[in-house]
Amino acid sequence: MFEFRKQAMRQRRQLITRVVVAVLFVLLCFGILVNRLWVLQVERYQGLSERAERNRITLVPITPRRGDIVDRNGVVLARSHRDYTLEMVRGQVGDIPKMLEQLEQIIHLSPLELRRFKRRLGSSNRFASVLLKSNLTDDEAATFAAHSYKFKGVSLKARWVREYPEGESAAHVIGYVGRISERDQEQLEEKGLEGNYRGTEVIGKKGIEASYEERLHGKTGWEEVEIAASGKPVRVLKRTDPIPGDNLRLSLDMGLQKLVEGIYNDPKNPQRGALVAIDPRNGQVLAYVSAPSYDPNLFVDGIDVENWRRLSDSPDHPLIDRPIYGTFPIGSTYKPFVALAALTLGVRDPNAKIPDPGYFEYGGQRFRNAGGAAYGPTNMHKAIVVSSDTYFFSLGPLIGVDALHDFSQQFGFGKKTGIDLMHEKKGILPSREWKKNAFKNPAQQKWIPGDTISVSVGQGYNSLTITQLAQATATLAANGVYTKPHLVNWIENPVLKTVEQTVSEPEYKVDVAQEHIDLVKSALSDVNATGTARRIFAGAGYESAGKTGTAQVFSLKGTKYKAEALNKRLHDHALYMGFAPVDNPRIAVALIVENGGWGSSVAAPIARKVFDYWLAPERANIPEYIPSFDDEEQQEEISPDLEIPENIPANPDDNAPGHTPEILASIDMNRNGRDDVHNDEAGAL
């Protein structure tokens, strides 16, 4: 009995202990829970509340409309328009092949579109929006909208698409836009501009599109969108409208531009080359031709392999921007500047007559006139008019290469002109220092007299751009006043309705006497009146000045030049520089026809047509552009990536019969792959 009671008491104590432990455990858990609730509801309330709000609200970028580019008369060269696309988020589509099969029943997908889609799909993450089809017609967009509920993860979107209405015309000036690359993204981040490019797929790659990117792009807008638990947008809480990019009005005249392009691109005799025309009074570039050209529209959505190979493998190199990137010996067009150097440095009396037997002998070597011509006693005026190589051969050693370098550079040779395009080359204006740095072999580093003699007629190591020659010609026409050339005349803000004129002020005046300039101008005028270009300019209703030039492509080594016996690519380059009218120059021109032969017979006729067009009496009645926004329409900016209906149907069956369901565009902060071939510098696959 006693043992039984003792055992009962022991069990009771154990029960009490267990109850106490259980109670303490419950209290401990409750304490932990209360503490956690305190932390969440009090201590961390603000931060967690903001995080929850961020999870509920998504920022959707609204891409701004890129600014237009027009010529001086308002001809549209680049513009943006709306384009419908189909895009897919891989993570939201279960069976992609089945989806494509169903989609093809209502919208045609070409084999090329499918190949590109699969290629993009392979390089994207599961949450990225991948382009499936672009350039949908209105009918195709409406058809998909009516069946959109069948295609989960596929959305219809609108985007801004760049268009170049003039095609190949002025392509090297305008340039093109292309998909934002990793390098572009890094550069945007370095400048702190990546936020302004959210939702933007393209960026300026070449030409004006690149050099004025920040003005053309505009400012990205934003929408704060409330997102349902299903991930669908519910409503827009706040909207900041995008600011469209500025419009650019160029100094180019497309009538003149197309006239020159038509000459170079003559189907019967297409030519390679470049031409730049500048107004010497203000630096406005009136024409800028690089032939052959290309269609910038090919690059907007990414150029395909076939077209890329056609352009990049062409022996005519249409992608090269010849006026600023191609460098050439400029031949006799350099002689007027050599003459000015001699006059300024006082190395020869311009009236002194130098014997010209058809060659100049120096150090036991004979340097011959082109064509073996002999001009007899020749002064400076005559030497320019008849283009006596012998006369200028003899000037070279007297001036010296370094002095000639320093003087010529004042006119724009051997340095960047500052034209508002990227990737301009400095070219080669040789000097002793240049040669020392250009060659590793000590024997080749030494400057010899023969080098100076060749340079003095625009040959030898001279390798300059046509833009530099045009700028030097404009500076000479302006009596030594150097004004930086520019392509953009006006920048128009469509929102503020303001305009900004990009006037180039003269940078400096070349240190040369007016009497020396007048002497050279007089000789250049006689070149067109009685000299090497007299036949071309006969009957012109204005007085012009100029200089023809012929630059050797390879050395003849003492043999006679016979064009008919040479491969076309070995023919001499034909050049011309000039300005008109002589008394008050309004246009200065420099041009080259690659492997064209003689400048007087090939290049000068092009200049004559340019002068005739620009100085035609009827052009005197064309008024100068005066900015006005009286007829400007306000352009409402809407999000190309988001359409939110007022009432969201729970499913397609909730709609009335025949009702087209609303489109809920998926919200994707990632950029879309656009092309299977893209290059940053028009150079690499």
List where the protein language model places each region.
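Periplasmic/cell-envelope proteins involved in peptidoglycan metabolism and beta-lactam response
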Residues: M1-V305, T327, D402-G412, T452, ...
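Beta-lactam-recognizing serine transpeptidase/beta-lactamase-like catalytic domain environment
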Residues: F2-K6, R13, E226-R239, L252, ...
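Ligand-site clamp/hinge motif
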Residues: V593-E594
